[in-house]
């Protein structure tokens, strides 16, 4: 074989890579309606809003903060806020496990949506991969919006992004917050799962 003529195996590899890369295109961006928080005036009309207004009137110039340092108390408070919400629930979490606590809280969100509460859930795709089916089912509900934070271009080919865009590997969404009726919130260091709420077996 003369020099300068590519070996047939090399040509085959180049052709195969070209075909594979041609298939690596992103799906079209879906048109979604704009989602906004409820106005402060509307939030004040909810039971949570009334309760907060009463406390603010009783303690002018101050804000209310309560430390939730017990795991079980934190889960009870999260559940109570979800059940008390009448208009909106906004949640952002880095990790959401598919265990008892995680499943119970997802069920509470679905129940809230059935009451007519608009639920918006943002989770990090790295910490929720085992929940794909559950999150897809929730997102199909007319009152629930589920969004995944994922800095990679291709969700099912992360290894390719790890190799070609390693700087994105550590871009994660570490928020941990639940906001009810745009008025009361629980935030801190706890993700959603049995190990965070003291309900692990053993």
Placement of each model-derived feature along the sequence:
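N-terminal localization/anchoring segments of enzymes in phospholipid and broader phosphate metabolism
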Residues: 1-202
